A protein has these predicted regions:
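Short beta-strand segments within Ig-like beta-sandwich modules, predominantly Fibronectin type-III
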Residues: 116-123
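Flexible, glycine-rich phosphate/dinucleotide-binding loops
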Residues: 50, 114, 146
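Solvent-exposed loop/turn segments flanking beta-strands in beta-repeat/beta-sandwich domains
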Residues: 99-111
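Beta-strand-rich modules
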Residues: 127-146
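Pro/Thr/Ser/Gly-rich low-complexity, intrinsically disordered linker/stalk tracts
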Residues: 65-101, 144-155
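Substrate-binding cleft of secreted/luminal carbohydrate-active enzymes
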Residues: 1-74
Length: 155
């Protein structure tokens, strides 16, 4: 065809994400990590997205890009994972303490029996725990490597 249908591209992105390996110890991750799978995807042409051809950008924003995601790790820039965070209880939530090398935090909150994922900048160290029965946090360094996940069950 002259161009791929937008729905085909969205379905391919969703399929790639469903096969991506998860961080060891992350909520919902298998007991063993490192299974083969895609860690990300690349779009051939940014102009297609910028011009929203065939509504592709809109479909991606409403579908697989509606939720936060981490940039795939770049292990060729070093394979030592960052130190993990420490979670401290405070009024209204938690305080994340971690290494100066942190670029962001990978945050999972268990709300109503479902794990919800978010990404926070490293300078944002306060974590709202309203409605959460558990929280898990990992340090993410500038090359996308994750630390071990710190899990805290909340009362």
């Amino acid at each position: 065809p002259a161009s791929w249908p937008a729905r085909e591209i969205v379905d391919q992105v969703s399929l790639q994400r469903s096969r991506a390996p998860r961080a060891a110890g992350a909520p919902g991750a298998p007991a063993t990590d490192g299974a083969a799978g895609a860690a990300g995807h690349i779009h051939f042409s940014l102009s297609t997205l910028a011009q929203d051809r065939a509504g592709l950008a809109t479909l991606l924003q409403m579908g697989p890009y509606a939720r936060p995601a981490l940039v795939p790790a770049m292990p060729w820039l070093g394979d030592t994972p960052p130190a993990g965070p420490t979670l401290r209880r405070r009024v209204g939530g938690l305080r994340i303490e971690g290494p100066a090398t942190a670029a962001r935090w990978a945050v999972w909150r268990r709300i109503g029996g479902t794990w919800r994922f978010d990404v926070q900048p490293a300078q944002d160290r306060d974590l709202d725990t309203a409605g959460a029965s558990a929280v898990a946090v990992a340090t993410v360094d500038r090359t996308g490597k994750l630390s071990e996940v710190q899990l805290l069950h909340l009362p």
